[in-house]
């Protein structure tokens, strides 16, 4: 997804390496991978949306599509400051609707390709 790629390119080499390790775990374990590496995103309208959890508040929202492929939707840092302290809930409130739209678009595209 272009939204994810743009964000991924902004990461430091160390952050990209840490993410690559988590992505390898997702690839090996699939949907059963859980905490501390992955957790479910309950606020999404997609029951299968999850987040890859990296140190320092870095998160990647993703989902497995109906082909069982992991779709990386959007990433960011939930610890970014909003005033004097991090506001984790605000980050989720902002990015989950975007991730929902990206996943909707992806699913629609896959269904159109099947026709």
Description of each model-found segment:
Residues 1-2, 36, 65, 77:
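Alpha-helix initiation/capping motif
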Residues 16-19, 27, 34, 46-49, ...:
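Residues in flexible loops and secondary-structure boundaries
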Residues 15, 19-22, 37, 48, ...:
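Amphipathic alpha-helical interface surfaces
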Residues 3-7, 22, 26, 30-33, ...:
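Generic alpha-helix detector with strongest preference for long hydrophobic helices that associate
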Residues 1-22, 87, 103-104, 108-115:
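Arg/Lys-rich, positively charged N-terminal/basic patches that mediate binding to nucleic acids
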């Amino acid at each position: 997804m272009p939204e994810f790629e743009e964000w991924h390119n902004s990461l430091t080499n160390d952050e990209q390496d840490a993410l690559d390790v988590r992505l390898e775990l997702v690839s090996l374990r699939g949907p059963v991978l859980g905490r501390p590496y992955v957790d479910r995103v309950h606020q999404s309208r997609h029951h299968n949306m999850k987040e890859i959890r990296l140190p320092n508040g870095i998160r990647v929202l993703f989902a497995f599509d109906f082909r069982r492929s992991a779709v990386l939707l959007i990433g960011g840092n939930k610890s970014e400051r909003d005033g004097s302290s991090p506001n984790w809930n605000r980050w989720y409130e902002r990015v989950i609707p975007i991730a929902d739209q990206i996943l909707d678009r992806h699913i629609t595209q896959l269904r159109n390709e099947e026709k």
